């Protein structure tokens, strides 16, 4: 019996050493990959989403994919940047401009056109940067139709000098709907335009059970333009852009124009923006929140308790109450200008 246990312990010891050897080798392999220098991947011709996907599949963490001022069209499959432990896709940049090593100035843009056949981007990796890209004609429908332009479950997404246009999300069943952009985590937008996106829900839900929006994320917006976006619902809340998950959110130097949120038998508010955080040096012009049961407020801006709004201008916005803005419980509003805002109920400029 003693010899049996000695043999058993010897086997266990060998097995444990082998396991540690395999795990150690795997970790070393990952460290070597992570330490490797970043590379450029060039796509040199017009093509399809499959060409962009092939570039992403080749890329490793830290690489830059240059689309080199080309146009790529979709035919039913979205572009995916997978996340997870072994994807090795974190910190990838997808740049629509021409590679500077090939004479690019950094001002060129590439177009990703889904042709209304699919969502454009589905991003699971973290610290992904999209820059100099026109993201257009994305379409997504069904329950929880989130992000016809860009959907991200990864953290720290960056969009720089991008346009998200003509993207449409819709649902006839339960769930939220977001047309241009939806992220579960932090997003940084700079010099971006969100234009002519449409989010609709025809599911006759219990009042305000779900939300229909142009976009939802936490983080910051700087030097952006948000215009001509449309949100419509039956029963669900209809809102423009929502940035409410953190008091550190910031929106600055951004123009919101001609955005429309409407709800039948539900609540419509913040047709341009609903925010928790700081809003500064922004312009809100001709935005409108509408509800057939007089549950509309904040034709332009709805800011949450503890938020600060300063140096902003509100012109020609419309809602039942608080045509320009409403704030809840507490907040600070200073050095702002209000011109020709119209409340069909009360609070032409401000409602609390």
What are these regions (language model features)?
Residues 1-39:
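Secretory targeting signatures
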Residues 47-49, 53, 63-92:
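N-terminal extracellular ligand-recognition/capping segment immediately after the signal peptide
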Residues 76-83, 114-122, 141-151, 168-182, ...:
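Extracellular beta-strand/beta-solenoid scaffold signature
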Residues 75, 89-143:
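Right-handed parallel beta-helix/beta-spiral solenoid domain characteristic of secreted/periplasmic
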Residues 30-54, 71:
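Right-handed parallel beta-helix/beta-solenoid
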